């Protein structure tokens, strides 16, 4: 509710709005709230349910549903996909993510392929939550190039 009030006030002042989300709270966003979103940075963590759950503790479907709602509402989407070696970098997973993105149609302006990093680790420690990616390394250039090309093969602009 707080974000929607801020976005509504911003729109009244003519300010561009951008929601950064995994889409997990899909059903908490009413269609009326969607009206005040100009752009959504939508994190699609994985195209595989089991991997998605391992990375987030949640389920994939709310992210898909939210992306489809955004597309139906005519909102622009920048999909963000984090490349985690040995976890999200398989060809099959990337194909699944590409198919999810295709279900959003022309709403997807581009896909950002982001290399995994450990900058969030202190947050997990501070919250005293076990960090499942504690010893995870970041990607090297080879899988990043393959993943980028896989998305491009589906017609997406990729950064």
Give the ranges of each region predicted by the language model.
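A structural motif corresponding to the C-terminal lobe/cap of the Radical SAM core domain
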Residues: 99, 105, 109, 124-150
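C-terminal accessory region of radical SAM enzymes
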Residues: 76, 142-159
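Conserved AdoMet/S-adenosylmethionine-binding subsite of the radical SAM
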Residues: 1-119, 125
């Amino acid at each position: 509710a707080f974000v929607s009030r801020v976005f509504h006030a911003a729109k009244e002042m003519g300010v561009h709005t951008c929601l950064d989300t995994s889409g997990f709270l899909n059903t908490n966003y009413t269609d009326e709230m969607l009206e005040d979103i100009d752009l959504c940075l939508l994190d699609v963590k994985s195209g595989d349910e089991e991997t998605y759950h391992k990375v987030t503790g949640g389920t994939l479907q709310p992210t898909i549903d939210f992306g489809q709602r955004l597309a139906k509402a005519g909102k622009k989407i920048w999909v963000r996909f984090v490349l985690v070696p040995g976890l999200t970098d398989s060809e099959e997973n990337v194909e699944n993510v590409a198919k999810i993105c295709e279900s959003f149609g022309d709403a997807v302006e581009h896909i950002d392929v982001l290399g995994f990093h450990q900058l969030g680790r202190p947050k997990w420690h501070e919250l005293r939550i076990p960090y499942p990616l504690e010893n995870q390394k970041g990607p090297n250039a080879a899988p990043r190039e393959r993943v980028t090309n896989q998305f491009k093969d589906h017609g997406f602009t990729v950064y």
